[in-house]
A protein has these predicted regions:
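Catalytic active-site module of serine/aspartate enzymes centered on a nucleophile-bearing elbow/loop
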Residues: 265-301
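Alpha/beta-hydrolase-fold enzymes
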Residues: 126-212
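Alpha/beta-hydrolase active-site loop
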Residues: 93-117
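The conserved beta1-alpha1 loop
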Residues: 43-45, 71, 237
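Short beta-strand/loop motif that positions the catalytic acidic residue
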Residues: 229, 235-237
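N-terminal cap/lid segment of alpha/beta-hydrolase-fold proteins
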Residues: 1-32
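Active-site glycine-rich loops that stabilize anionic/oxyanionic intermediates
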Residues: 37, 42-48
Length: 301
């Protein structure tokens, strides 16, 4: 069944293959009765299912964009189902995945799928948190013409505001790692959102504890792909986000062939009490933050 959407938007739940053939679940949002002028791919934050982005995706589609949201492997509807017949998610114990896999296998396939389906439209990209990081790791990232990052950081723990940095340090090292090694996966109930595959959580923890985050990972060969991106790049920083401006600037600094534009937004700018790391996607921002984002994504040149 398609997800609920406004009357001027059609949405359809679909699947497409990752680069290694793994089946990924997605939702395609299309405008009804008007010409499509852009294709937009929305890539999620860590442990966040695609349904969180459906209202923003519908908003873009209503303006004439073909929009795809999707779940990374092991997350949301891209988590395999148990064989019980009750449509319950299968245990993540033994499930093999890392954040590098999400980028190389899942995000790259989503870019390729949209590029193939909408050959005649400019392909733009919205990356929330990890979704922004992932763009730099893609071998095919230069297929993207414009990228809008939303709270996308190189999340070294010491760049976070206090006391958030200490909460994250304890959560990852003294709660998350022991739980992950005991259970075989990181349970969402521990305070991270959705359950995470063991390999994803362990790699994320290593990055968070490294001064330049993923840029310090000697085994991450895909770092060399950052320089391939030559499109427009705008990165949104929210003043009340506990993951801070220096972390955003650190990530942007890796895009050597682009000229990143970092914009800091206060809640007052949006007429809101708070925005933080996740608030951009709340529908209360449709006439403020969303409109500005859409106009930038739809711009030419």
């Amino acid at each position: 069944m398609a997800e609920a959407a406004p009357d001027d938007v059609f949405s359809d739940n679909i699947t497409f293959p990752a680069a290694d053939g793994y089946t990924l679940s997605a939702t395609l949002f299309l405008p009804r009765g008007r010409r499509r002028h852009h294709a937009v791919l929305i890539s999620s934050a860590t442990a966040v299912p695609r349904k969180i982005y459906r209202r923003f995706a519908s908003y873009l589609a209503a303006r004439g964009c073909a929009v795809l949201t999707y779940d990374y492997r092991g997350i949301g509807d891209s988590r395999q189902r148990a064989v019980t017949g009750y449509n319950q998610p299968k245990s993540l114990v033994g499930f093999k995945a890392t954040m590098a896999d999400w980028a190389a296998l899942d995000v790259s396939a989503a870019v390729a799928w949209m590029r193939s389906r909408y050959k005649n439209l400019p392909l733009n990209y919205v990356g929330h948190s990890f979704g922004g990081q992932a763009l730099g790791l893609l071998a095919n990232n230069n297929d993207v013409k414009r990228a809008l990052f939303v709270a996308a950081v190189a999340g070294y723990w010491k760049l976070m505001k206090s006391p958030e940095r200490y909460r994250v340090f304890v959560l990852l090292n003294f709660v998350g790692l022991p739980l992950t090694r005991l259970l075989g996966y990181m349970p969402g109930w521990a305070g991270i959102g959705e359950d995470l595959p063991k390999g994803v959580f362990e790699q994320w923890t290593r990055w968070v504890m490294s001064e330049r985050y993923l840029l310090d990972d000697p085994d991450l060969k895909a770092i060399t792909n950052f320089v391939k991106y030559k499109g427009e790049l705008r990165s949104l920083c929210f003043s009340d986000d506990l993951w801070t401006l220096p972390a955003i600037e650190l990530l942007c600094s890796a895009f050597k062939s682009a000229t990143p534009e970092v914009i800091t937004i206060t809640p007052q700018d949006a007429g809101a009490k708070a925005i933080g790391h996740f608030g951009f996607f709340r529908p209360e921002h449709r006439d403020t933050l969303w409109r500005g984002a859409a106009e930038w994504l739809e711009a030419e040149g």
